[in-house]
Amino acid sequence: MRKITAIEVQKRSPNRVNIYLDGEFAFGLARIVAAWLRTGQELSEEKIEQLQAEEARERAFQQAMLFLSYRARSESEIRQNLRKHEIPEPVIEQTLERLRQDGLANDNQFARAWVENRSAFRPRSRRLMAMELRQKGLADEAVSSAVESVDDNALAYEAAQKRVNRLKGLEWNEFRKKMSDFLARRGFSYSVIAPVVNRIWNEAHKDEQHYEEEDLT
């Protein structure tokens, strides 16, 4: 048995404490893990190991919460981040399970939210959004479910509307090329791009000659 001789709050991390056993520094703990410890208390080696295991789980959970504080993440992204911080694999799996139970890790919800955000702020094709989600480690089932209702024609039109003001003053041929290239970079196919470019041009030049259905080649 080893006796706790001091519990000191860390100066740089007030949410953590230093534990001294038998007059010597032993280890640091999150305050939530050390909440039940008292000076003079005796700890067995088994209890010390339990405390350190709890500390590892708490450290992993706090790191995951910090990572999630910037934006929602896929489970694969969370796992990769914890690995980068040298969290042991068993602790990573325990952390992910805790996040799932708290509703903080759900790939289906993440995929739907990602598609909604992309559609609203940076419209792109169904194919490109699916590719992005797969790059984030999502399973095909979650990806397919999230993008199944994506309308490429509507999103291409929205993307073009957001872009058209930057192309004001251009002649038709240059406008057509720049807008087509922009939409192609957003992942849209030629069959979607062609009518959208004509529509956007005609809407911006209502009193001028229309170019409906003109071949973009």
Feature roles, as predicted:
Residues 1-217:
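An alpha-helical, amphipathic repeat domain used for nucleic-acid recognition
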